[in-house]
Amino acid sequence: IYDLPADSLRATRGFLAVTGTLAKDRVTVIVCHWPSRGAGSYYRELAAKQVKAIKDSILHHDAERKVIVMGDMNDDPTNRSMHDVLLAKGEIEEVGTDGMYNPWYNVLVKEQTGTLRFRGAWNLFDQIVLTPNLVAQPSNKSRKGLHYLNHEVFRRDYLLQTEGKWEGYPKRTTAGGVWINGYSDHLPVVVYLTTK
C-alpha cells in the first residue's frame, strides 16, 4: 500500500480479492492485513481508502454483488480508518449505500471485549464487514438470498491462557522465544450467513 512515489519504498501488504458464487449469490471477499500500529494511522487510513475504492468499483460494475471485507485491520471498529474512511458503521440504520455494516463495533464498545489484549485492554483488530445488501434493514425484513445472521468472537477455553500473569489473554504460540503450544495472540472472528 502506498500513495506517493516516495512511499513506494515503504509499500506494505496488498489485498486478496476472491470472487465467486456462494449460495447462488455473486460474492467477493476482500482479505486484508493492514499496516501495523507502529506505522502510524496514515497507512491504515490509506489501506481503508484503497479497500473502499476496490469495493466501490466492484459494486459500480455489479450493484447486486455482495462484498465481504475481512482481516486483521490493526485498528478497532471505532478508529478513523474503519468508521470514517471505509464507512463501516456499527448500527444497521447508519449504513449508507456506499457504507458497510460492522457488527464488531458494538462488541468492542458495548460488550467491551475483543480479539486481542494489549496492556490489559481489549482491542478488536480482526473484523468482518459487510455491504448493505448482505444485511436486512430494520425497515425491510424481507431477505433474498445470502444474508447476515449473526457473529461472534470465537472464544474457547483452549484458545486462552488459563493461569499466571496472562490469564484470560489469547494463548500465543510462543512467548519470549519459548514454545507455549498456543494458537495465536488474536482470537478468531466468525460471521454466520444464511439463505433462510
Predicted segments with their positions:
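Residue-level recognition of the N-termini of beta-strands and the immediately preceding loop/turn
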Residues: 27, 64-67
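Solvent-exposed, acidic/flexible segments
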Residues: 8-11, 40-48, 118-122, 184
